[in-house]
């Protein structure tokens, strides 16, 4: 593998020239879905400038992990994550970190590939301070309770109906025009009884 090098303006121009015209699009997930579908969920600071591998056209960001919420077994003996990897082009869902505040903490939910943390534009990456207190509680404690049995089911157009008793209908985008509505910021889809999951309130108190 070719070494990673600082992302220079010439490389940016090359990537722009060879990138397909169609941009990456995806539907942002409910935070619980992001947690359950990710291999690794951490809190970290972006502390370095992006570096690009000119052979694979992947870039990496240096991070400083401050907390891990999911992935202890998947990570194995590795005690720390120092880099996060993403495609170097936005057209293929590459994530571009736009904050220059190196002391700001971010919630990062991603996939592990060969022991390396990978994210895309479609991954859940958000400033920790932008999360509601309920969402913080979900990531630190509660979302995991619903991962095995429950599914957040997006409702994007009418009519939509539940396909299973273990599904919770997510209507934020339909009713409020945003994935950051009430259900996203304050609720989790959790087991009520065997074979049944319902939206349940997340207390604002952090455990």
From Swiss-Prot:
Task: List S-S links within the chain.
Answer: 24-93, 26-122, 36-147, 150-197, 155-160, 168-189
Q: Which GO terms describe its cellular component?
A: extracellular matrix; extracellular space
Main location as per UniProt: secreted
| UniProt signal peptide | 1-23
Enumerate the glycosylated residues: 53, 101
Its recorded name reads Metalloproteinase inhibitor 1
Which gene is transcribed and translated to give this protein? TIMP1
Kindly list the residues the record flags as site (Involved in metalloproteinase-binding).
Answer: 37
Chain spans, region Involved in metalloproteinase-binding:
24-27, 90-91
Which positions are annotated as binding Zn(2+)? 24
**Homology family:** Belongs to the protease inhibitor I35 (TIMP) family.
